[in-house]
Amino acid sequence: ASYRWIQLILGIVAMAMIANLQYGWTLFVDPIAAKHGWSRAAIQVAFTIFVLTETWLVPIEGWFVDKFGPRPVVLVGGVLCGVGWFINSFADSLATLYFAAVISGIGAGAVYGTCVGNALKWFPDRRGLAAGLTAAGFGAGSAVTIIPISAMIATRGYQDAFLYFGIGQGIIVVLVALCLSRAPEHKKGEAVANVQQTKRDYKPSEVLREPVFWIMYAMFVMVAAGGLMATAQLGSIARDFKVFDVQVSMMGLTLPALTFALAIDRVLNGLTRPFFGWVSDQIGREPTMFIAFAIEAVGILALFHYGHNPIAFVILTGIVFFAWGE
């Protein structure tokens, strides 16, 4: 029983180490633009490429996990994540930046998909909680590194931040990967009473023929778009709202509004995952999604109308990320 918790913790650590590839990106956009004179739109194409390769290749990476186990897939993913940020550190053309996005996206997808899938296999009796805790590593992982990354960008330049954090995070993921193991096939758990669960596994071709799959796919594309927009563009939004470097004092801390928002957002984005995982085990998946999606929608609209106030900016971005992390 204790061994599966060790496997869960290892997955959480790996997820935390790849979080900055997505959640820390907004800190780099303006420094890159200032150095090379590229437009924000051109730079953000790299983020789009990253998200596409991070998500769309997960089924293929899942096949490798089924065939070879989680260890080699996460190991390769960790190497690719480190290499991607290493390339970013010296990228002097948009083509190189885009290539690095492909590399790091494949790596992040391999780590993310494998760690979540492995957690579900080790905890068939507590799937919502296991998935939530593992995803929390990704959501909150950058909370402890956002401030030092921001400080390094300000003092030593974004290239050093890419280089040192990329290599460091990649090494940790590789070390974690060496300790991962496949859940035993015979491991069973009691189904959660309040949650409907399928009686059999579906083949990919069968899944594609189910209407509910396409409904869920469209639903999550739309929901993810709102959160990813905030993730990638938060720095630019803060500048447009003129709250980027306005000092905000809350909870005994005084930080620039953007830095404060990023730190709080990452904490809430992490806490919400096990929270909503627990809620979904209690009331079901569909009611939980309805609640979370509604909160996110209200948060984004409120941010649009009231985000020019630095305190409101911090609080409302926290609400958006709390709901989006579900």
Language-model features: where?
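Residue-level signature of mid-helix packing/kink "hotspots" within the transmembrane helices
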Residues: 23, 51-59, 142-143, 266-274, ...
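Extracytoplasmic gate region of multi-pass secondary transporters
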Residues: 25-30, 205-278
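Intracellular juxtamembrane helix-capping segments at the cytosolic ends
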Residues: 32, 110-123, 130-131, 326
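Helix-breaking motifs and short loop linkers at transmembrane-helix boundaries and internal kinks
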Residues: 37, 69, 90-95, 107, ...
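Conserved MFS/SLC helix-loop-helix module at the cytosolic interface between two early adjacent transmembrane helices
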Residues: 56-95, 280-286
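Paired small-residue
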Residues: 84, 95-103, 311-319
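Helix-loop-helix hairpin linking two adjacent transmembrane segments in secondary transporters
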Residues: 134, 138-185
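C-terminal transmembrane helical hairpin of 12-TM major facilitator-type secondary transporters
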Residues: 220, 227-229, 252, 256-326
